[in-house]
Amino acid sequence: PQTFVTLEIIPGDAEDNSVRKIIEIEREIVELEERAAKSKIYSLNKNGSEYKIGIIDLPSFYLDFEAWQARDPNYKSSSKDVKNILEDFKKQSVDAVLVDLRNNSGGALTEANKLTGLFTSAGATLQIKESNGNIIPWGDARVRQAWSKPMAVLVNRYSASASEIFAGAIQDYQRGLVIGQRTFGKGTVQRLDNLSEGQLKITESKFYRVSGDSTQSRGIDPDIVLPSTWDIETVGESSLPTHLPWDKI
């Protein structure tokens, strides 16, 4: 059935809160297939030899929570899709992989954890610091490494949250190069509490790289910097007036 959400908006140039606009938007179902991982293989000739480079375009760290909680074995997730792509790359004798996380704003923390495990078996993916000060290392020993050949990660200023967890772990374990621009700098974890007329999002913890550095505010600095079409000082967590500061554990 058709359902709608009503937004009450106060224009930024309004002199007082009595000036409001009412906008009604029809809800639509977002199909996971529309933002699923995609792959391409390019051939590169160097010194008379041909190399195959596999590109994985990952727009988000998606997970079908309802199917996963219902223990549906066919639930959709980014880590499952990427694993299938890597298996296909092996069959086609791909020499190296580039994971494209540009404009990937994040997603499920568990998926960032599992995806990291597909490329390295080194250990924890990240550390989470709770509001009470407890520090919990995160890793998933059940995930088997699916790719051991060379790899790199492509990021930009809009790569955030789970993207930064993945890129940071790949960099900290020296598993591959991070290429592009400094990432967004979102290093916090949120939860959703249900209310009678909606939900409340609460920031409850911060995550840290295995090196102990936070990604909050500073993001991930790439190993190889590519030119940017925008000023990084006007985009990202650090550009927000009330952002939480960077720290380390």
What are these regions (language model features)?
Residues 17, 117, 199-200, 216, ...:
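Short, functionally important structural connectors and interaction interfaces within domains
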Residues 159-161, 198-216, 220:
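Metal-dependent DNA phosphodiester-chemistry modules and their immediately adjacent helices/loops
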Residues 1-196, 206:
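Cleft-lining beta-strand/loop regions that shape enzyme active-site pockets
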Residues 215-249:
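Conserved functional hotspot residues or short segments at active or partner-binding sites
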Residues 148, 173, 197-202, 221, ...:
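Active-site lining segments that contact anionic ligands and/or coordinate catalytic metals
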